[in-house]
């Protein structure tokens, strides 16, 4: 059974000025060190909180890589939840589940003309190896079963519902287009992501 292990206060965001709490967990199936970042005590004060399931992206989240939009999506979610409350489930699923080194191998292939999915497939991986069962377990540990999910990804929508979480609403993030990620974003759209690249 999954339960909260520790709950600590910290300030987050680009200027470390947004109050939040970080939660660790016991009893997750794979024992990966996923965490939840809770804003405005949303797990205690809201019946249907905003939730983003954000998969770790070292290159984008930490180093602000031009190749993806992960860091911008994370920052958008933090800023949104600072106002309205919410929960970010930060999941250790680098590279859509293939790991950091394999993702860097995929980047090499992308530099030679493959898109993000073709590169993963060429390395012997599926389009997306992530599983969101542990995200549902984390929500269960917080006694949350209905959420407003912040995502553009149809797989996340399907998977979290398959694990028993009810979606009250799907909230899309903006399209964060910048030099270097245009092909990546177009590939996501081609795979069903709800992104308006014309804005």
Swiss-Prot record:
Q: Which domain of life is it from?
A: Bacteria
Q: Which residues bind Zn(2+)?
A: 57, 68, 70
The reply to whether NAD figures as a keyword in the UniProt entry is: no
Record-annotated membrane-spanning stretches: none
The UniProt note on the cofactor reads as follows: Binds 1 zinc ion per subunit.
Q: Which terms in the Gene Ontology molecular function aspect does this entry carry? A: GTP binding; GTP cyclohydrolase II activity; zinc ion binding
- What pathway is this protein a component of? Cofactor biosynthesis; riboflavin biosynthesis; 5-amino-6-(D-ribitylamino)uracil from GTP: step 1/4
**Catalytic-site annotation from UniProt:** 128 (proton acceptor), 130 (nucleophile)
One GO CC annotation: cytosol
Q: What does this protein do?
A: Catalyzes the conversion of GTP to 2,5-diamino-6-ribosylamino-4(3H)-pyrimidinone 5'-phosphate (DARP), formate and pyrophosphate.
Output this protein's name.
Answer: GTP cyclohydrolase-2
Q: Which organism is it from?
A: Aliivibrio salmonicida (strain LFI1238) (Vibrio salmonicida (strain LFI1238))
Q: What is the lineage of its organism?
A: Bacteria, Pseudomonadati, Pseudomonadota, Gammaproteobacteria, Vibrionales
